Amino acid sequence: MSKRAKVVVSPEKIKKQSDIIEELKIYNRGKNKKYMITTYGCQMNEHDSETLSGMLENMGYSITTNKEEANLIIYNTCCVRENAELKVYGNIGALKALKKKNEDLIIAVCGCMMQQPQVVKEIKRKYRHVDLVFGTHNLYRFPELLSRSMETEGMFIEVWDEETGIVEGLPANRKYDLKGFINIMYGCNNFCTYCIVPYTRGRERSREVADIIREATDLANNGTKEITLLGQNVNSYGKTLEHPIDFADLLRALNKIDGIERIRFMTSHPKDLSERLIDAIAECDKVCEHFHLPFQSGSNQILKAMNRKYTKENYLSIVKKLKDRIPNIGLTTDIIVGFPGETEEDFQDTLDIVQEARYDSAYTFLYSIREGTPAAKMQNQIDEKVKQERFSRLLDKVNEISAEINQSYLNKVVEVLVEGPSKTDSNKLMGRTRQNKLVNFSGDESLIGKLVNVRIVECRTFSLNGEVIQE
């Protein structure tokens, strides 16, 4: 699938779904139908849920957070961690009693978990009250799938093993007004040995630049101030397109859009990080000085077993280049503890990277066996007690450095995009710096949606408190 012409879903197929949306809108008129979506996992799943929500709003449904009043409940699932899967099973099971009380309730389960045959088999066997099951590759067909499930006795299942083309023009009900997610690519070609994503999201496919710019421009025209570009590995953007282009070119093009104040992106694979990209981040005024660069392990032996295709030394040289070129950059990362075969020496190498790179924050994970991945069959699986002990030490080191970095912001003036009321104090506002630091401060609600200067007066491990500087 190297050419764009091979991966586009035809306008006729999209129109068919639009026609079904209109039919369901007429059918639902005056019925006050409500839906609820629970999303697990990454920002790509969140964006998929925004698409499902947009379709449902166009069908005449309105959103609710109350299961008791919902006519349709959707779980959009994640299979990266076992814990997320267990939560899904628990929540689906808990709906059985509600289904008995309300036989007209439609329960749908979708997302990455459904791309695994053993999961679908488990749902068919143990959760027969589920009405609709679909995966990641046919999400654009949701209107048709919902319609067919309404006409079907029992469970309706449609999961495609192969990825579809890139779909343009689907409606989306954005979770945030000021911030918007934009998928720039789908799938992954890296096949890290611990990761199930290439098997659930398919191989890498990039969207055309013109389509991405059109979506970003539409968001800007509707009041969006900040966009986050999404991909499993944004650094390899453009490789499947017919005309040569890379992620650095895309950033420079998006930087020219009027109305967009900030550009963020995730996730980046270290092996594909070019100096051209570092230059683009440094030179584009709207691209935020924040970089999420997962390293997963500091041990070259473990990195090789993970199929990460870089070494500890490679990674640290990239960090140095980023900090030299963008001195005020905020760095975040992903770290896995307890990968099969990890020794105490290997773990010390991980702590070494944390100490040298000095991350603003880190997403830390205990290694979780994922059926269907090479790592699941590896020898020397690590004892859970050892994992937990190492995880605790890692967390202590990460939090210690995070607190030190945050303390360096005391009395500094930072630019904050005001997002809304603080989650910890409803009398305050909250927003984020360009480095993605969470800042709480007092201010009038008229500031929401604006860029303001805030002086930091208190520093905490995970957030900052400040005072607005009046112009």
Curated annotation (Swiss-Prot):
Under the heading SUPFAM superfamilies, the entry gives: Radical SAM enzymes (SSF102114)
Entry-linked PANTHER family = CDK5 REGULATORY SUBUNIT-ASSOCIATED PROTEIN 1, MITOCHONDRIAL TRNA METHYLTHIOTRANSFERASE CDK5RAP1
Q: Please give the Pfam families that the UniProt record associates with this protein.
A: Radical_SAM, TRAM, UPF0004
Q: What protein am I looking at?
A: tRNA-2-methylthio-N(6)-dimethylallyladenosine synthase
Q: Which organism does this sequence originate in?
A: Alkaliphilus oremlandii (strain OhILAs) (Clostridium oremlandii (strain OhILAs))
Tell me which residues make up the Radical SAM core domain.
174-404
Give the TRAM domain ranges: 407-470
Cofactor binding notes: Binds 2 [4Fe-4S] clusters. One cluster is coordinated with 3 cysteines and an exchangeable S-adenosyl-L-methionine.
InterPro entries for this protein:
Elp3/MiaA/NifB-like_rSAM (IPR006638), Methylthiotransferase (IPR005839), Methylthiotransferase_CS (IPR020612), Methylthiotransferase_N (IPR013848), Methylthiotransferase_N_sf (IPR038135), MiaB_methiolase (IPR006463), rSAM (IPR007197), rSAM_horseshoe (IPR023404)
A GO molecular function held by the record: N6-isopentenyladenosine methylthiotransferase activity
- Keyword Iron-sulfur recorded: yes
Write out the residues that bind [4Fe-4S] cluster 1: C42, C78, C112
User: Which reaction(s) does its UniProt entry say it catalyses?
Assistant: N(6)-dimethylallyladenosine(37) in tRNA + (sulfur carrier)-SH + AH2 + 2 S-adenosyl-L-methionine = 2-methylsulfanyl-N(6)-dimethylallyladenosine(37) in tRNA + (sulfur carrier)-H + 5'-deoxyadenosine + L-methionine + A + S-adenosyl-L-homocysteine + 2 H(+)
Per the record, the similarity remark reads:
Belongs to the methylthiotransferase family. MiaB subfamily.
What role does it play? Catalyzes the methylthiolation of N6-(dimethylallyl)adenosine (i(6)A), leading to the formation of 2-methylthio-N6-(dimethylallyl)adenosine (ms(2)i(6)A) at position 37 in tRNAs that read codons beginning with uridine.
Q: Which residues bind [4Fe-4S] cluster 2?
A: C188, C192, C195
> What EC number(s) does the entry state?
2.8.4.3
CDD domains reported in the protein's UniProt record = Radical_SAM (cd01335)
Localization, UniProt: Cytoplasm
Give disulfide pairs as residue numbers. none
Q: Does the keyword Amino-acid biosynthesis apply?
A: no
| Domain (MTTase N-terminal) ranges | 33-151
| Gene label | miaB
Question: Which cofactor is essential here?
Answer: [4Fe-4S] cluster
Sorted alphabetically, the Gene Ontology cellular component annotations on this record are: cytosol
Q: Which UniProt keywords are listed?
A: 4Fe-4S, Cytoplasm, Iron, Iron-sulfur, Metal-binding, S-adenosyl-L-methionine, Transferase, tRNA processing
**Subunit structure, as described in the record:** Monomer.
